[in-house]
Regions:
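Polytopic transmembrane helical bundles with strong interfacial aromatic enrichment
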Residues: 1-199
Length: 199
């Protein structure tokens, strides 16, 4: 299945280039990539559990934690799609208006650019709430993953704001997207780990 998804996403990537950054195709390409990350993350944690059977402690997956993780995963996917849309629109506007400054390019975007920032800080508060839930009752791999999620979201917000106010290299955008994609996979791993620990 993973091999099929990789091939399909590669083919869709070629279509993205030939379509001159069609926003719908770019978003579809990103959705497929995130689905691939989720599948690979699930396969990774399943393999890890088989090899390290004794590494998991008896931890109950509470309803609060379950709902928080599912909500966090959904919000991150939406956040990535919003960011992809913003980046695509900026590049399309820059092609049509090559003399626009960075500020003018940002001003040309719709109001959903603010939604991207608001959602980012919502993710930060939600991840902080998860850290609070894991503070006393959770140990080992699960707690490490929760703190990694919180730290990565903080770094992503910092990097996103730096990209707005400073002329950072183009590779920064790539790392910004990669970091968010890692979060999608880490949440899948964490949720699956807790499900296992509950059983």
């Amino acid at each position: 299945m993973s091999l099929f998804l990789v091939g399909a996403n590669g083919g869709l990537g070629a279509i993205v280039v030939s379509s001159v950054l069609n926003p719908f195709i770019v978003s579809l390409h990103m959705i497929l990539a995130l689905f691939l990350v989720s599948v690979l993350s699930y396969a990774t944690i399943e393999s890890y559990k088989l090899i390290n059977f004794d590494s998991f402690t008896s931890i109950l997956l509470s309803k609060k934690v379950s709902i928080s993780l599912i909500t966090l995963w959904i919000f991150i996917v939406i956040e990535i799609l919003l960011g992809t849309g913003i980046r695509t629109n900026i590049e399309l506007i820059a092609i049509d208006n090559p003399l626009f400054s960075k500020g003018e390019l940002l001003d040309s975007l719709n109001s959903y650019k603010y939604l991207h920032s608001i959602l980012g800080f919502s993710l930060l508060f939600l991840s902080f709430y998860l850290c609070y839930l894991f503070k006393d009752d959770f140990l080992g791999l699960s707690k490490q993953l929760v703190y990694f999620i919180f730290g990565m979201i903080m770094f992503q917000i910092f990097l996103g704001e730096m990209m707005i106010f400073f002329e950072l290299p183009q590779l920064t955008r790539l790392f910004h997207t990669w970091g968010s994609s890692w979060l999608v996979g880490i949440i899948i791993i964490l949720y699956n780990t807790l499900q296992y620990e509950q059983s």
